[in-house]
A protein has these predicted regions:
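Second-shell loop/turn segments in exported
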Residues: 38-42
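Bacterial N-terminal signal peptides
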Residues: 5-15
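Short, active-site-adjacent cap segments at secondary-structure transitions
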Residues: 135
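SH3-family beta-barrel domains
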Residues: 18-36, 46-51, 58-132
């Protein structure tokens, strides 16, 4: 019976530890180096050139975060190049409404692939900002 409790405790610990490392972040600058490993001594793998691009943090080591993007590219980025601002990229064209209801005034058409900043969300609606539009 002790082995069963130990196994359950072990499983719970590693499940919550793994999920704690996974968070969503955005790129802070319009030019961010992605490296092969968690340090400046590792060579640059590729360079992002999009500010606010959403990425998912999947691991961390000291001041570096391992990230993965929407196209499943992954690598290591220094924490100074990341921020905790939520952003999204819609997969299809969307309509931006002035209020959180389908009956409110549409104020813009959002093209797929555009980076949108998320200000806050309820169960069904998110308040977003893109360029000069907000809704």
């Amino acid at each position: 019976m002790k082995e069963l409790y130990l196994l359950i405790l072990f499983w719970i610990f590693f499940t919550f530890t793994a999920s704690a490392n996974e968070t969503f972040l955005s790129l802070k600058k319009d030019k961010v180096n992605v490296r092969y490993g968690p340090g400046f001594e590792y060579p640059i793998k590729y360079v992002y050139k999009k500010i606010n691009l959403p990425v998912k943090q999947i691991d961390k080591k000291e001041n570096f975060r391992r990230i993965i993007d929407l196209k499943n590219n992954s690598g290591w980025i220094h924490i100074s190049q990341l921020k905790k601002v939520n952003s999204i990229i819609p997969k299809t064209d969307k309509i931006l409404f002035s209020r959180p209801t389908n009956f409110s005034k549409p104020i813009a058409k959002i093209k797929k692939g555009r980076i949108l900043l998320v200000e806050n969300c309820t169960k069904k609606w998110c308040k977003i900002k893109t360029g000069k539009f907000k809704g």
